[in-house]
Design a protein with these regions (language model features):
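Conserved NAD+-utilizing ADP-ribose enzyme module
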Residues: 2-5, 13-38, 60-62, 71-162
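Short, well-structured hydrophobic secondary-structure segments
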Residues: 39-74
Length: 162
């Protein structure tokens, strides 16, 4: 199988059920969050293009988002998912072939999205530069998450701890 990476993904429980039923989870344009204008859609399309350029085949689908570098926390989920946690989400812990994992800097990605929204007026640093998966949290995009890779699924609390 080659080199593997340990990753975590936050997914709605409906997508976890899809993963269990179909044996894999792939990105779908219908699951890309909506935004004012088309900023998020353009960002996801740019990520798909960057993945293809890096040799990660996407078949034209948006990525499955994951995290590497260190285990994720409930606080990470609250920060990244926000209010929709109340509708039922889980953390999927899995390993994936390194060749299918495109890791990039999340801060630079957010700067890029902010520019797509036109809120910064600043040209962001290159966000699509491959980033090593070390000990710091890094975003990882994959074309697929296979059920065979899953180590554990942890349901997330539906509200913030008191």
């Amino acid at each position: 199988m080659g080199a593997i990476v340990e990753l975590w993904s936050f997914q709605p429980l409906t997508r976890v059920a899809e993963l269990e039923a179909r044996g894999e989870l792939v990105g779908s344009w219908e699951h890309v969050p909506s935004s004012t204008g088309d900023a998020i859609d353009r960002g996801y399309r740019a990520m798909t293009t960057a993945m293809e350029r890096a040799g990660v085949p996407t078949n034209g689908r948006p990525p499955v988002w994951a995290w590497g570098g260190r285990p994720v926390t409930v606080a990470d989920a609250e920060s990244l998912v926000g209010e929709s946690l109340r509708h039922g989400w889980a953390t999927i812990e899995f390993t994936a072939p390194a060749a299918l994992a495109m890791a990039t800097d999340y801060g630079a990605w957010n700067d890029y999205l902010a520019e797509l929204f036109g809120t910064t007026g600043v040209v962001p640093a290159a966000w699509d530069v491959p980033t090593p998966i070390g000990r710091e949290l890094v975003q990882v995009c994959l074309p697929v998450l296979r059920a065979a890779w899953v180590r554990q699924v942890h349901p997330l609390p539906r509200s913030a701890p008191a």
